[in-house]
Amino acid sequence: VVNFGGHQVPRVIADYSGKSTITQASLFAVGYHYSVPLDKWNITDAACDYLFLGDRAIDFPVPGTLGVIYNHAVWLQHKEQERSYPFIRAEHFVKGVERSPKLNFVYACLKDITDELVQALNGDPTTVLLIDTWNKHGYAEQRRLFVELINRNCQCPVVVGRAYRNLSPGQLQLYAATDMGGLLIDSLGDGVFIAAENCGPDKMVNDTAFNILQATRTRISKTEYISCPSCGRIVRWATTTRPTTSSMACARSRRPSRWRRSPPSPGWRATTA
């Protein structure tokens, strides 16, 4: 569905529904940098794919790679806007409200998963299911929700959504990584949506979403340097250690023959080949 599911990487949805005003500068935190002199957008590697505005609206053209999600009633007023999509609750979706011909986000919790809803989702190739939970043990409930979708043969992509409030940045990172990472690492989910109220800067929340995808190896957005398990060197040390290791190798090659290991016998080579 558009860029969800299949062989696509999981998508990141940023929550801007709680902001009173949204300007070009507001998108800096989610990876979109607007250049006033050049009148163009510069996009970082950790730029979110969609922006959830809820009942809010923006009065400027968004970058070409960014989709905007409105609550259904507000979307009806902006449906002619390019790359704008509705956010529809499950009970309204089943009743057959007006939909976008390109992409529709359907909000559902475990109690909303019924045969009627799954049939409606499978019958519309433009739908993406955005799941949420109010359960204290939300991770287990959302895993159960995925089991229900699998048992009912639901074919639409699923975005894992979680809401947090009044947490420190460290707590948010730990909770979100546990709640979402455990699902993504089992290939459950085609995107993430973190709604964090009073939990830290928007940039930190956005980076947390991308770091979760990076840690689960479902979407690589930055280069990682892994040290050698033997000596502890990493790539950035290679330029300083290579001359040393090269000279050591040359010294070993100049040792007398009695210090060298004798070549393996043909029988050993045949056994290990």
Regions found by a protein language model. Give the residues of each.
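Active-site beta->alpha loop and helix N-cap motifs at the rims of alpha/beta catalytic domains
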Residues: V2-F4, R11-A140
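Catalytic alpha/beta core domains of metabolic enzymes, predominantly
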Residues: V1-F4, I13, K111-A273
